[in-house]
Amino acid sequence: MIRKCTDHGYFRGGSCQQCKRPGRYVLDDGREEKLGRFVSGTLRHFPASAGVKMDKYGWIDLNAFCEVMKKRYNWMRKEYLYALVESDEKGRYQISGPMIRARYGHSVNVDLDYDESDTPYVYYGASPEEVDVLLENGIFPIKQRYVHLSTTYEKAAEVALIHTESPVILQVDAFRAQEDGISLKLATDYIVLAEKIPPDYLFVLED
């Protein structure tokens, strides 16, 4: 459920996390899920099939996107898109003026123009079966445009636990990689994107 606090904006759940007031009802769980799936799919994977035009940086026109969604969901209102984006705790989407895009997770070919990360080390969680292959060949994107790395050990472990019960965390020497010309783009506070990570910059962290 998405609600709106007059002081702190949109939030998910029954009360504002900052002031604990219930705020104004905006969107129920069912509609939030439907919109979320369509927004994620369109901005990351199938903009053309959804009927919107995406530029090389992943941006699409917000008003045009709302019109597409209104045709699909007759209950759709523009506010719902803002509510979905602004209440998203993972920061998956970005609105800038009249445009909207996904911050990460793309399978379509985009050139995300983020600033370079200044984190000296970033992290990648893998299954035990993957480790030797990664140390030999490096990390390449699978079904996505970019390799997704974490800015903290804890986040890398959290992500890896989705896919394996016994994650192994690889540390990436980001500072040295960038000195050697490898771009590491800061997508969110916790996510760094790269075209690939060669094996020379990878190290296994022991528990």
Swiss-Prot record:
Record's keyword annotation contains Magnesium: no
Alphabetically ordered keywords of this record: NAD, Transferase
Top EC class, one word: transferase
Record has NAD as a keyword: yes
Domain of life: Archaea
Entry's EC annotation: 2.7.1.-
GO MF annotations, alphabetized: NAD+ poly-ADP-ribosyltransferase activity; tRNA 2'-phosphotransferase activity
Alphabetized SUPFAM superfamilies for the sequence: ADP-ribosylation
GO annotation, biological process: tRNA splicing, via endonucleolytic cleavage and ligation
Functional summary from the UniProt entry: Removes the 2'-phosphate from RNA via an intermediate in which the phosphate is ADP-ribosylated by NAD followed by a presumed transesterification to release the RNA and generate ADP-ribose 1''-2''-cyclic phosphate (APPR>P). May function as an ADP-ribosylase.
Family: Belongs to the KptA/TPT1 family.
Name this polypeptide is given: Probable RNA 2'-phosphotransferase
Biological classification of the source: Archaea, Methanobacteriati, Methanobacteriota, Stenosarchaea group, Methanomicrobia
